[in-house]
């Protein structure tokens, strides 16, 4: 158990953030993959465990104006409609600034590499350093999944835990 590593000391109070991204769909090309993130991120939802806040940041769907989209979410706390993907990514980076741990479902194989790639494409490679601590860049790493080699990023100084992998590892299943 992890708490045994603290040698009878109280475990630190970590700021844990869970997040999930949604990506636009291209009817001609289909869903984009982290290796080729050609479609924009349209929304990011985060749960900040330390403040018990659920936050959603989104760009308006193509069928609504900015004002119509903002009006449609006015009754939802902590739901923010921004004009562009760049604003969405900048807001996301600001929200996770205090997070010690970042987690999501299938985040190693999708959300982390897709988000880092979109930040580098839409904002700048330098801005992707905000995913890490100490102004260090995310470290590209290859891993194997379902017999295929895929790429993800390690977030230097910030712990990343893929909740899907944790679930698979620690959930009892009869074999």
Positions of the model-derived regions?
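DnaQ-like (DEDDh/DEDDy) 3′-5′ exonuclease domain used for proofreading
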Residues: 1-98, 132
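Conserved DEDDh/DEDDy metal-dependent 3′-5′ exonuclease domain
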Residues: 57-174
